[in-house]
Amino acid sequence: SHFEGSTEEKETATVVDHDFMSYTQGMKFFDPHMHMSSRTTDDYQALADAGVVALIEPAFWLGQPRTGLASFKDYFSSLVGWERFRSSQFGIKHYCTIGLNSREANNEALAEQVMEILPLFLQKEGVVGVGEIGFDDQTAAEEKYYRAQLEMAKEMNLPVQVHTPHRDKKKGTE
């Protein structure tokens, strides 16, 4: 367990977990926003044990800038291929959204290249929308590529999964 605390707190947590598992036993769950690329197969097993039968994994910023188009292709390919396979081993249906994350929109030369390949990936099996797109630093480039991806979603008749900024959220959502 990731729960840290006194022995009494741990015992209480176990009781709560047991009660919760009894209460939800037999129920099925769908998680609409989960980043599985960074998780282990133990996490898939825990999800299956908890009754999760399907999830959507949005494309996102991996914590460091991608510096070339090949890294985007590899990442998008893993979402539509490898992660679907991994989740299927646990009886979980894996869907995803594909998009240029706001943090990576500020490298405009690379962003233009990514925009060219997005339609190819948006047509793949298991892709259910454009995302996760939106704002982070709230720059003109982020606005440009957000609007371009909204237009792409409209043309392809796909829903959009929106990312709101971590900082200055009010400004970024007005």
Where are each of the predicted segments found?
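Mid-domain alpha/beta scaffold segments of enzyme catalytic cores
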Residues: 1-174
